[in-house]
Amino acid sequence: MVYFGKTLNRDNMEDSVKMSDIDGLGMKPANLDWANMGFGYVATRSHVRMTWMDGRWSEPELINEPYIKMSIAATCLHYGQEAFEGLKAFRCKDGKVRVFRPWENIRRMNNTADYILMPQVPEELYLKCIQMVVRDNQDYVPPYGTGGSLYIRPLLIGTGAQIGVSPAKMFDFIILVTPVGAYYKGGLTPVEALVITDFDRAAPRGTGHIKVGGNYAASLLPSKKAKEQHYPITLFLDPETHTYIDEFGTSNFFAINKDN
């Protein structure tokens, strides 16, 4: 429940300071401009959360507050023991809401979890969590024909306290959702990319092949430099030889080398 009183446990905010002014809360689906949505965060009704401890997952719960309470010594904060995914739900022409290829994202996250010593989320339980949060926020799925979607962000984080460099003993699995428009407003309009030659997008024998936040934090500086030169996206080369195309900063690279 979102509470607007004095005892918020958020530095005792005054009554005159609304949480909606700070966190983007309070936006109702009826007030959203579906035709002009960007790709940003809009707080929705709920997220789903469950905790792993003593070798098992708790039952998933729908939570209304968009905050996490954890130890200041949590491994996700100190050592980057976290993984995330991104997938979408679309409202189709028949009015039904469908999630695109969830199994692929589930398997990729579990592959990441194995690599950085986090517990896997069983596939059926993972899917149940997706269904719960999408169903509870289905009025935030943009209408068919607007080009928008409900972005689904699963997050697996080490929340157990650990000062030494070792795996946590407690983890949280969270899925938040937010309505978004197209990532590129121009649609299929071509854009120019800056080829990055002095920075590696992914460490070939590190975490480059899995989806962890550190990979993205490391790309913020070259992305900033590209935008300063008026390039909306970056194109990275392979980290071993710097002679082959690797990927864009925001997506994979596909090339058409023959016109049929």
Each model region followed by its residue ranges:
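Compact soluble domain cores
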Residues: L125, Q138-D139
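Extended, Lys/Arg-enriched charged tracts that mediate electrostatic binding to polyanionic substrates
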Residues: P142-R153, I157
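Short, charge-rich binding segments
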Residues: Y140-G145, V165-P167
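Helix-start/capping segments and mature chain N-termini
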Residues: V2-C129, V133, Q162-N260
